[in-house]
């Protein structure tokens, strides 16, 4: 059984603390044979940049004073990947799962999350795909117009996961211009709104993403 939680608009620091506590709790329960709950958490964050454990600080193009001027924060975090942006109009999804319940390794799990987002895009008539050597979901792959619509970065310990994905829905894409997103200098960023040229209902996107992740996990369990 998987519990779905919607944390609404929540500061990155509070969400990080809450998901870390749930992550540690699940690992402890798993290792000690106690009952536990698999969770998928949805939320949005105020303007924030997160830099993965192997990320390069040079991919943040603003100094602390400039960050303050655009009302954004910067956090170094314990996930894979480089730097990315989170903000209003973007769904962040944090699955806190015991992957062994779903017979998944980490690589297969990331592939599953990508597949769910690809299928969400398809429901809006948008063709999305993966890029070899890069995580996340992309549009116009293999062309000069290649652009990213969903970033991913996960931490795993004892096959328990935290962190997850960030899907741009009605995101203010200007905030990506202050970084080299995910460490890429020559690739663009997009959103459902930018592709469809109209605002997209946030709840509708979350419902579709939730349904597709659950369907794909059910197939593997």
Task: Place the predicted regions along the sequence by residue.
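Glycine-rich, charged/polar anion/phosphate-binding loops
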Residues: 149-156
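Short glycine/serine/proline-enriched coil/turn segments at secondary-structure junctions
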Residues: 84, 158-160
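N-terminal lobe of the biotin/lipoate ligase/transferase fold
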Residues: 1-149, 182, 199-200
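Short conserved catalytic/interaction loops centered on acidic-Pro-aromatic/His motifs
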Residues: 126-131, 162-163, 175-179, 220-221
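C-terminal accessory segment of soluble enzyme catalytic cores
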Residues: 138, 155, 173-221
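Conserved phosphate/anionic-ligand binding catalytic regions in large, soluble enzymes, centered on
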Residues: 160-169
């Amino acid at each position: 059984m998987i519990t779905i939680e919607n944390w609404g608009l929540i500061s990155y620091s509070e969400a990080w603390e809450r998901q870390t506590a749930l992550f540690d709790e699940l690992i402890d329960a798993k290792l000690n044979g106690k009952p536990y709950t698999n969770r998928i958490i949805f939320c949005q964050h105020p303007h924030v940049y997160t830099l993965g454990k192997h990320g390069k600080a040079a991919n943040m193009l603003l100094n602390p004073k400039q960050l303050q001027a655009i009302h954004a924060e910067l956090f170094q975090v314990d996930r894979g990947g480089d730097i990315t942006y989170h903000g209003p109009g973007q769904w962040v999804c944090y699955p806190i799962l015991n992957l062994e319940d779903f017979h998944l390794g980490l690589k297969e799990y990331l592939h599953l999350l990508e597949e769910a987002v690809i299928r969400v895009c398809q429901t809006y008539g948008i063709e999305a795909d993966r890029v070899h050597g890069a995580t996340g979901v992309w549009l116009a792959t293999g062309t000069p117009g290649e652009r990213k619509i969903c970033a991913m970065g996960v931490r795993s310990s004892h096959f328990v996961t935290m962190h997850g994905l960030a899907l741009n829905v009605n995101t203010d894409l200007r905030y990506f211009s202050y970084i080299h997103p995910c460490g890429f200098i020559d690739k663009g960023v997009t959103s459902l709104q930018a592709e469809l040229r109209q605002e997209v209902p946030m709840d509708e996107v979350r419902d579709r993403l939730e349904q597709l992740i659950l369907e794909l996990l059910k197939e593997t369990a």
